[in-house]
Amino acid sequence: MELEHPVWDADNHYYEALDAFTRHLDPALGPRTVQWATIDGRQYHVLGGKVSRAVTNATFDPISKPGCLHDYFRGNATGVNPLELLRDHEPIRPEYLHPGDRVRVLGEQGLAGCFLFPTLGMIYEEPLKHDPEAVCITFRAFNRWLAEDWTFDYEGRILTAPYLSLADVDWAVEELEWALDQGARMIVMRPGAPTTVTGVRSPFDTSFDPFWSRVNEAGITVVIHASDSGQSSNGYAPDGFTVNLRQGTYGPSIKSFNIEEAIHDYLLSMSLAGHFKRFPNLRIASVENGAEFLPDLFRKLRSQDKKAPGWFGDDPVEQFRRHVWINPFWEDDLETVVSLMGADRVVFGSDWPHIEALPQPLDYLPETKPLSPDDRRLVLHDNAIELATARPCLLYTSDAADE
């Protein structure tokens, strides 16, 4: 397909360097945070004193090839066991670790630029949540590594998001200020309720208003990315984010739907809490969470609007569309997602170089054929650029937010 515009990939990942979590970490705090351990000749992270098996090889060397599960997610017409696909390894590539090499590869892939998100960083808050201070210590160290190795804006082509948590609201505000000073164009968080020193709280509890108020004022986009959200299977399957290829078997599980359930609950709760009314400059981008949850979420919003007239102050679905951008899975029906959200609220993201990604980002282009040229440009480029552009405003008062 010939394009008359550039393409921006809104979901790329790096693989963390060996010292990503420890370079800026006081070794004395290792037992509470992140350490390395060698068990049976294999290296593992130890998180808060417990060995993590969230990934098979936390060194990422060797690593499965990008998009090796593409055919499986496309429908698995050949009936192959996905564990067999994951055993096709290669040495870690320099573009997974270094921005200069990544920019070169972006050019080879035909991309103008990308948003860059963590791999391990997206799944380490949950195992540490029992110690909120350790969460903050860990991700402060992680973000300092990230700023050193990748920067938050590399040549205007790689925009890397620091990871923030609401485990401590004062820390979150302080870390947000630091990120803004460092030139961050967006921040990334997980779709889950944080555990604080007083227990689990909704991210939209008023105790977190200092953080959301500063986000609202700065006009920076908050990316809510798929993660270990802590979503429970309620006994129908073991909880926890774990991969163990040594078992040699794979079967369907209710856990396969945890990602869409987590983002559904997060965004629905955000809407029901009146968050968009209270913070009218918020921009939320849901990345790598898919889009199948949208019809059910919209149905529930309309139902609640009828049961609580005036609560939202506006049509809640239209309010949602004004504040939320959706990155569908590449296997989602793009035309349907655009019909639900509008072309100006959908962003392309390949998830490269993860195993469930597209082998090459522009393999997505055939999915955009049903769109008009203008809508295609929005999805493939313009919407991402809008999200990466800060939209600062004066502090909103509650009266101003109601107008």
Positions of predicted regions on the chain:
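Conserved, mostly hydrophobic/aromatic
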Residues: 11, 106, 179, 215, ...
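Short catalytic/ligand-binding loop motif for oxyanion handling, primarily in non-cytosolic enzymes
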Residues: 15-18, 23, 114-116, 122-128, ...
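Alpha-helical packing segments of well-folded alpha/beta enzyme cores
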Residues: 17, 21, 98-109, 138, ...
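Metal-cofactor-binding active-site regions of metalloenzymes
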Residues: 33-174, 331-346
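Catalytic pocket-lining loop regions of alpha/beta-barrel enzymes
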Residues: 137, 150-151, 156-159, 164, ...
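His/Asp/Glu-enriched, well-ordered alpha-helical/loop segment
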Residues: 280, 344-391, 395
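Conserved small/polar residues in nucleotide/adenosyl-binding loops
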Residues: 396-402
